[in-house]
A protein has these predicted regions:
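Structural/interface elements that position substrates and couple domains in central-metabolism enzymes
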Residues: 1-281
Length: 281
């Protein structure tokens, strides 16, 4: 069940995996899920260890795709390739598909980080090393700092007293969950570098205040966040951030620098309006 879509996911699941120990348990669970599973092939029965492994392996596979694409995006930037075209090209391959191929500033939340760690720890207890998943974790932790690194490079290593606007605090849209959110890493690094931060998120403001208190300023809306800002960092791709009024930003920002952590903006369009634009890849 995805945060923000749990009810819909329950009513219309892709598949339901059930671990059972007896035929009686299977019959009971089959009867329970039948109204929601008109296509019986989406109801999968297996033993309990396999059911647990399916859950952890599925989320770890998705996390792997994200970290892989972030690695590819960073390489694209170095060799002059367009990561969006690369994403479309490999996503058009029916063996791969287009989902979870979007580069960004790292994944967070309660599921992906936890499940990747769980498989790594389970393997260690069994005397095995999950080398791929360890790399997935390493790439993701590094990726959470990528907007900071780009900003630091833009200002030649000096962010002291820079006014930085953050759009998005939650780890993804449609939730206030900030567990393992990239915004937390960004905030820590920006404060350590001496920058001032003003942040806005449609619903995660209270959660952010609970977590970090008054270490940053909190905006009343997305445009208040960018008032007199030296740079804007897009961290969470909320719908309301997708089509801002760039004319307002151009008039209210001190220095029109935009760092797009989710690659949702048109760089050519922004550069045509005299913005300095950075994306992932």
């Amino acid at each position: 069940l995805k945060e923000g879509d749990a009810v819909d996911d329950f009513m219309k699941p892709d598949r339901v995996v059930v671990g059972v120990e007896s035929e009686k348990a299977k019959i009971i669970m089959e009867r329970l899920y039948k109204p929601f599973m008109m296509n019986n092939y989406r109801l999968i029965f297996t033993d309990i260890p396999s059911a647990e492994m399916i859950k952890y392996a599925a989320n770890s596979m998705l996390a792997t795709r994200i970290s892989f694409m972030n690695d590819i995006a960073n390489l694209c930037e170095l060799v002059g390739a367009d990561v969006n075209m690369v994403r479309k090209g490999i996503g058009a391959d029916s063996r791969i598909g287009s989902k979870f191929l979007y580069p960004g500033c790292g994944y967070g939340g309660s599921c992906f980080p936890k499940d990747v760690k769980a498989l790594i720890k389970t393997a260690e207890k069994s005397g095995y090393s999950m080398r791929v998943l360890k790399a997935v974790e390493e790439v993701n932790e590094s990726q959470k700092s990528i907007l900071f690194e780009k900003l630091l490079k833009h200002y030649n290593g000096d962010l002291k007293d820079k006014q930085i606007a953050l759009w998005g605090l939650a780890f993804k849209p449609e939730t206030d969950d900030m567990r393992e959110a990239p915004s937390l890493v960004l905030i820590d690094k920006l404060i350590e570098a001496g920058a001032n931060i003003k942040a806005y998120d449609p619903i995660a403001m209270d959660e952010c205040k609970r977590r970090i208190g008054d270490r940053i300023a909190y905006a009343t809306d997305m445009y208040d966040a960018v008032l007199d800002a030296d740079a804007l960092l897009l961290v969470t791709e909320w719908k309301e951030f997708r089509m801002p009024s760039w004319s307002i930003l151009g008039k209210t920002m001190k220095d029109c620098v935009v760092l797009d952590g989710r690659n949702i903006y048109n760089g050519e369009e922004l550069r045509g309006m005299d913005f300095i634009y950075y994306k992932i890849g």
